[in-house]
Amino acid sequence: MKILCLHGFRTSGSFLQKQISKWDPSIFAPFHLEFPDGIFPAGGKSDIEGIFPPPYFEWFQFNKDFTEYTNLEECISYLCEYITTKGPFDGLLGFSQGTTLSGLLMGYQMQGKLLKEHPPFKLFIAISGAKFKDPSIRDVAYKDKIKVRSVHFIGEKDWLKLPSEDLANAFEDPLIIRHPQGHTVPRLDEAAIEKLQKWTKEIIVAHSSENVLDDIQKIGNGDAVQKIPQDSHDNIANGHKDALGDSGEKEQTVDAVPT
């Protein structure tokens, strides 16, 4: 399964990759993660200058109230082409601006506004983010609950805490993992690791079951949908157990770097 990972404002794909790589490796062991850079060079000072080397990028620009956006259409067009040509992608992961943008793409896809030929996204990992405030965007992208399995990391000291909660509410049955940190890719304690491992395992099992069903239909007569025996489901789950791990047994130390 492939996940497209979108970085925060005026950072880079390699910076987000470094942060995510410090999480327990079993969490994303079954996935292939891609970390592209934003399409525009940073138009000002980056919060990670002196902490992580340039270049830095941004996906689009916005005003102080986050009600007006510049180059957003160009950004969306670029990402749709990227997803179409280098995908399919099973899900998105985002931090801050990357989270906000990912949520928009998923909402638009569900409403049939873009990525019509791309398979529906199956998962979303949101690390701080917000909804777009412009009514012309908001009233379309978040019109209905977004039916994608999602996990949302929300920091107690994050200046985007409330917007992150609002974005989580746009999804159907979101998993919310709270942490005491600020606007950052958080350190994960044992409880958070275990929750995330369980969440990813459920997605892998569901994805594997869908693939088995597809294979059965392809080799059948094309009309009848056959049920998968329970022992097949068990074998699927057990087959991924080693890769995913039973539980998180150590705390990860991710540098709390604001972006």
Describe every region a protein language model picked out:
Residues 1-88:
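Serine-hydrolase catalytic machinery in alpha/beta-hydrolase-like enzymes
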Residues 4-9, 128, 154-155:
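The conserved beta1-alpha1 loop
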Residues 93-103:
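Gly/Ala-rich beta-loop-alpha elbow adjacent to hydrolase catalytic centers
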Residues 115-130:
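A conserved short beta-strand
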Residues 132-133, 154-162, 183-184:
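Acidic catalytic loop of the alpha/beta-hydrolase fold
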Residues 146, 151-154:
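Short beta-strand/loop motif that positions the catalytic acidic residue
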Residues 156-174:
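Conserved loop-alpha-helix segment in the C-terminal half of the alpha/beta-hydrolase fold
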Residues 182-194:
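Catalytic histidine-centered segment of alpha/beta-hydrolase-like enzymes
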